[in-house]
Amino acid sequence: ILDEIADDMVLLEKQGIRFALDGFGTGYSSLPQLQKLPITRLKLNKSYVQKVTADKDSASVVRAMIYMAHGLELTVVGEGVETEEQKAFLVKNRCDHLQGFFYSEPLTFDGFAKLLNSEGTTARRAYLSVVDK
């Protein structure tokens, strides 16, 4: 069934749709999927990200996943960033994008629009415009 899904994804990719493998390292996400599916972005599961500063084995695993993803020409997103230390670790290890409560709690559309229009969010707007391109 994975081959059938991959074929459908390739057709969608040709129409400009891009795919991310979410929660990499847990559940059904696996190494064979990285090779078979036409994904452009790998999202590291927050269960790994949240342990990088407290557990050296988790830190080693995350470093290896980032390195491997870049070797496959994938963009890497670190999910679940909650602390400055986690952010610093991921930035130091060349994680391309970060997301989590460190930046913002989940927002409604109206709350997001209000955040973008509030004072002091120039850096956030600049970051979002870069990420969105």
PLM region spans:
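EAL-family c-di-GMP phosphodiesterase catalytic domain
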Residues: 1-3, 13-133
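Conserved functional hotspot residues or short segments at active or partner-binding sites
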Residues: 8
